[in-house]
């Protein structure tokens, strides 16, 4: 069987139970005030993994995609990847059309060097070490938060290039609201959604549950797809590769004066056809992530948080030839997290106001994987226990943040740390310098796969420094960051032993630039630019599939000046620079430019219609050699809310 597909991970079956397990391939003193009249977006990085609640641009480069952003930027994409690609320093490569394996890189990292969480619960396959990006449904999430740079002291393993936090949809205390939508478009694509959310009233037959918030979403996406591969690949097969995905997300929450409890579940099922002539060429995935969280305000300045998580991935690999047996890969992760946070304020030093926050935390994770082959030492299992301490302090216009983490993984100790210092130079400009180290754990495939794995592998390690300048002006927000990362112990394949070993070194330097603001009154604009120098020092080459320049421009306009306030139109431009597909830099991937158009019209308070035209000029390009991307496609949708 083709190793490329056998090593792919899988996805999970189970459903939400507040008392069940709770929890997840390829591929501050006051902050500076804005200038008068400035209309600025709010950045609120949520405290789900023991970061201070004030964690923001003063500690690390942070980008947030709101629900409105997701609706605009990926209206026809079933996965979250298209929206992520609009952020500075984020690049996406994919092996074909919808549903095919995808890889997300932050600041030149590999896909396995990005930590991903859903409502604070880690996701990603223990077998491959990569999140199932193509199977993360855009419609399930309220917002997305991306932290660029190392954050292992707060998030643990794999947070080398950055962290992606996905937060599921939730009710905001409003009465019941239900939305039904139907969409369709090119490649025989059909999209059906139902979403309801609200708060149980404190009167009536359910008064005993008064104040309980709930949300439930159902999503069905079906497409005939495209021919994912080109004839240059040896396993190419003619014909389209259809994809069918079904998603369910649910959440319950209840809050009193000083405590709250919530539980969520996200279930995904998909059926994908892919090219792999003579071997397994159909993949059935089941994925479940579920969690339970409790919060208590011990005092007005002290908070206690406890959460439990469970993630299960199950994947079935089928072949067209019935003589070829079906393979099954099953992995699971159980986790718990406990933290205590205290804020101190009202102090003065040298005549300046002094405040701070201290957080201590303990995390535990247990990972297991059941492979379709015999492993000599039995079922691969890994336990991870971690203690961490976080401290922030603000004196006048200067803020300091330090974090340290001591982790015991499979009996071996790993220590990581982060430090940042920011200075509010003026009410408009804030400067920041930071340092962090991080690590990436070997995947179970790296360690144990028969005929390939090496159980003596050590974690990959990195050290990063960053300098940044942020400006909050009347014209919008500007951010510039320059970073330098050195990676050691990179896991690379050794042809002499037919197994991976720790021999690689990399030096990654880059600049991230971003702008977000409004031109006039009705035209929001966002621009993201990434400049990357990703050097593989071991092979004296470029790290593969890392474009050296990326640009994303998004412009929208509401036509209020013509009294058409219900009409909104927009355009997106995406550019990816040249790169190579292979580590030896022998397979060239040219640059590409893609333009998308969109329009939305609110007919009345209940009914909205929208349309998108993607890849307007029908550019034929590749983000992975031999794999096609979508050509020009059209998609329309009707939504009704009641």
Language-model segments: residues:
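Extracytoplasmic beta-strand/coil segments of soluble accessory domains associated
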Residues: 81-125, 142
